[in-house]
From Swiss-Prot:
Function: Bifunctional enzyme that catalyzes the oxidative decarboxylation of UDP-glucuronic acid (UDP-GlcUA) to UDP-4-keto-arabinose (UDP-Ara4O) and the addition of a formyl group to UDP-4-amino-4-deoxy-L-arabinose (UDP-L-Ara4N) to form UDP-L-4-formamido-arabinose (UDP-L-Ara4FN). The modified arabinose is attached to lipid A and is required for resistance to polymyxin and cationic antimicrobial peptides.
UniProt entry tagged with the keyword Lipid biosynthesis: yes
Annotated region described as Dehydrogenase ArnADH, given as residue ranges: 314-660
An example Gene Ontology molecular-function term: UDP-glucuronate dehydrogenase activity
Catalytic activity: UDP-alpha-D-glucuronate + NAD(+) = UDP-beta-L-threo-pentopyranos-4-ulose + CO2 + NADH; UDP-4-amino-4-deoxy-beta-L-arabinose + (6R)-10-formyltetrahydrofolate = UDP-4-deoxy-4-formamido-beta-L-arabinose + (6S)-5,6,7,8-tetrahydrofolate + H(+)
Protein name (record): Bifunctional polymyxin resistance protein ArnA
Site positions for Raises pKa of active site His: 140
Record region (Formyltransferase ArnAFT): 1-304
Record-stated family: In the N-terminal section; belongs to the Fmt family. UDP-L-Ara4N formyltransferase subfamily. In the C-terminal section; belongs to the NAD(P)-dependent epimerase/dehydratase family. UDP-glucuronic acid decarboxylase subfamily.
Binding sites annotated in the UniProt record for (6R)-10-formyltetrahydrofolate: 86-88, 114, 136-140
Residues annotated to bind UDP-alpha-D-glucuronate: 393, 398, 432-433, 460, 492, 526-535, 613
Chain's gene name: arnA
Gene Ontology biological-process entries: lipid A biosynthetic process; lipopolysaccharide biosynthetic process; response to antibiotic
Length: 660
């Protein structure tokens, strides 16, 4: 059977050997050039291919159309990937009529993504394994063909576990490759609700945070021990590496990072103590702990730190454009609750953020993004994370001011995105549930649902299309220029400070604010086209917690992801929303200050929004990506959100001229 192989590392070598032993004909092998900054302790796929007389290639981008065409000319019946480090495009996967299969170093669906060998040790797992699975467009998500479990011993380190996984992989392939060849395999779909995903690790990720428990730090040492770069710490400005360690249940009142003793070299942790068994200074030699202590000049009571003493101990700088808006002001509140963020904000007003103006870690400038371009560029360069939250996002404006929607939502934001590319800054961009348009899927999925909009003569879609286009531009910058990004799509977030009643008076507000204004003024609640359109309403606190976790980006799991943030359990029609709001209004303690309820009135969308409007019947999110990347679930019931939103707006009304 003819195959094309994508391979690297020891797993790549053993995978090739297993294919040849099983009688496969390998037409070509694709691999990588070695990274000079990486310690090459593993076998060379290129050398093995040359020794076996198999054509071998190492293109920078195997997914380029020219390479896709060359692979197509090889007419592979089946494709295999063994630790190839780049995603293989769907066009290549579809070339093999018998399918494509990947060897992954974990028990899928657990530990999808990068560096599973290291992550299982970091997380203190007692079991892992190897999985052969069918390749699909999404990484590590295809049906499982075979798995073998591997026990992780307490004394395993990265290299010993690597050898165990290689041994298991040989066994797995010996058992499974003949079955694939003869078309005799049983595939089991992965359970998405059990999936976890982890990002790539870099040497800088392995610093020892002494406030953590000793067991956690010991697991870090195990996970990156030689030949990996090693866990590290500092004495003053001098860096040293810890190659091996032991956990001591030492009860000490010493501050975390303090040296308890030098022989053995024992360091106080957040819980217990860590013995440094072996280590080395800088580019020196490996030595046992007490000698390392002597070399570093450590004595009892000395303090270690996770970064150089001279390093700037600064907070993560977050730039929020549109900081006075609904999301911006709530996000600012959440960030300032922590002690490691500095927030820089720009907006044309400050009423919603007045409570932060005297906060020492909040810096605000009043201005317009279309005018303050120099200020914005300077702060993009200065900050670590950029959130451009400025947009026109009220439906009536889509038909009333379509060109202004395009200019602000696309053109102004594109300039900010290009600043992020220029200065290599992380951007977290607010897409919208509107991009799904008239999609007919039961659940709108970030990776699979089609984005369907109406004809050009319906200007209502200019917001959706502007947002979709900028999503695609960001994605392209990520693919081609290495832009670090996350796109998030809010689904009908509600809560205090959503719009204001003055905006509702001119029709430029979200649905619930407009309904509250009707109740406050004693005017009929207008149900556009009967109010049967269904939406999934999400409490702002749930939404902000998800957004905060995107900013935190644990394990880089959010990089390059599109994440719906909504509550599929809080689905209701606009009519049902109005009824729930009315019930809450009638029992509110301030109810007697307001006029009698004037009833519901059905109106046509064209008379309310103007010519060129189309509505969407339903909009329910899949939150699979949010669960996978953020470990997040929405928790707050819709009635609680309605009650709190109504209460907030009623208490903003001047009651001095109202009858008591």
């Amino acid at each position: 059977m003819k195959t094309v192989v994508f391979a690297y590392h020891d797993m790549g070598c053993l995978g090739i050997e297993a294919l040849l032993a099983a009688g496969y004909e390998i037409s070509a092998i694709f691999t990588h050039t070695d990274n000079p900054g990486e310690k090459a302790f593993y076998g060379s796929v290129a050398r093995l291919a040359a020794e076996r007389g198999i054509p071998v290639y190492a293109p920078d981008n195997v997914n380029h159309p020219l390479w896709v065409e060359r692979i197509a000319q090889l007419s592979p019946e089946v494709i295999f990937s063994f630790y190839y480090r780049h995603l293989i495009c769907d066009e290549i996967l579809q070339l093999a009529p018998r399918g494509a299969f990947n060897l992954h170093g974990s028990l899928l669906p657990k530990y999808r993504g990068r560096a599973p060998l290291n992550w299982v040790l970091v997380n203190g797992e007692t079991e892992t394994g190897v999985t052969l699975h069918r390749m699909v467009k999404r990484a590590d998500a295809g049906a499982i063909v075979a798995q073998l479990r591997v026990a992780i011993a307490p004394d395993d380190i990265a290299i010993t576990l690597h050898h165990k996984l290689c041994h298991a992989a040989r066994q797995l392939l010996e058992q499974t490759l003949p079955a694939i060849k003869h078309g005799n395999i049983l595939e089991i779909a992965q359970r998405e609700n059990e999936a976890t995903c982890f990002g790539r690790r870099t040497p800088d990720d392995s610093f020892l945070e002494w406030h953590k428990p000793a067991s956690v730090l010991h697991n870090m040492v195990r996970a990156v021990a030689d030949p990996w770069p090693g866990a590290f710490s500092y004495v003053g400005n001098q860096k040293f590496t810890v190659w091996s360690s032991r956990v001591h249940p030492h009860a000490s009142k010493a501050q975390p990072g303090s040296v308890i003793s030098v022989a053995p070299l024992l360091i106080a942790c957040g819980d217990g103590a860590l013995e440094i068994v072996t280590g080395q200074t800088g580019d020196g030699i490996t030595m046992q702990g007490s000698q390392l202590a002597q070399t570093l000049g450590l004595v009892q009571g000395s303090r270690l730190n996770s970064q150089p003493a001279c390093a700037a101990r600064r907070r993560t700088r977050v730039l929020i454009l549109g900081v006075n808006g609904f999301i911006g002001n709530h996000l600012t509140e959440r960030l300032l609750r922590e002690d490691h963020y500095e927030v820089y904000g720009l907006d044309i007003g400050s009423d919603a953020i007045s409570r932060f103006l005297n906060h020492p870690h909040f810096h605000f400038v009043e201005g317009d993004i279309s005018i303050h371009s120099e200020w914005i560029e300077y702060h993009v360069k200065k900050c670590d994370v950029v959130l451009p939250l400025v947009a026109i996002a009220t439906p009536i404006e889509y038909t009333r001011n379509p060109l202004r929607v395009f200019e602000l939502d696309f053109e102004e934001n594109l300039r900010i995105i290009r600043y992020c590319v220029k200065y290599r800054k992380r951007i977290i961009f607010p897409s919208t549930s509107e991009v799904y348009g008239m999609c007919s899927d039961k659940y709108f999925d970030e990776d699979h649902s089609n984005l369907i909009v109406g004809p050009v003569n319906k200007p209502r879609w200019i917001y959706s299309v502007s947002k979709q286009l900028i999503d695609r531009v960001i994605w392209a910058y990520g693919e081609k220029e290495g832009l670090q990004f996350t796109l998030f799509r809010p689904f009908n977030w509600m809560g205090p400070r959503l719009d204001n009643l003055n905006a509702a008076r001119i029709g430029s507000s979200r649905a619930i604010t407009q309904l509250i204004l009707n109740l406050v003024e004693g005017s009929p609640i207008k149900l556009i086209d009967g109010g049967k359109q269904k939406r999934c309403f999400t409490d702002i606190r749930d939404g902000i917690e998800a957004l905060y976790r995107i900013i935190e980006n644990a394990g880089n799991r959010c990089d390059g992801e599109i994440i719906n943030i909504g509550n599929p359990e809080n689905e209701a029609s606009i009519e049902e929303l109005g009824e729930m709001l009315l019930a809450s209004f009638e029992k509110h303690p301030l109810r007697h200050y307001f006029p009698p309820f004037a009833g519901f009135r059905v109106v046509e969308s064209s008379s309310y929004y103007g010519k060129g409007y189309q509505d969407v019947e339903h909009r329910k999110p899949s939150i699979r990506n949010a669960r996978r990347c953020l470990d997040w679930e929405p928790k707050i019931d819709m009635q609680e959100t309605i009650d709190e939103t109504l209460d907030f707006f009623l208490r903003t009304v001047d009651l001095t001229d109202k009858p008591s």
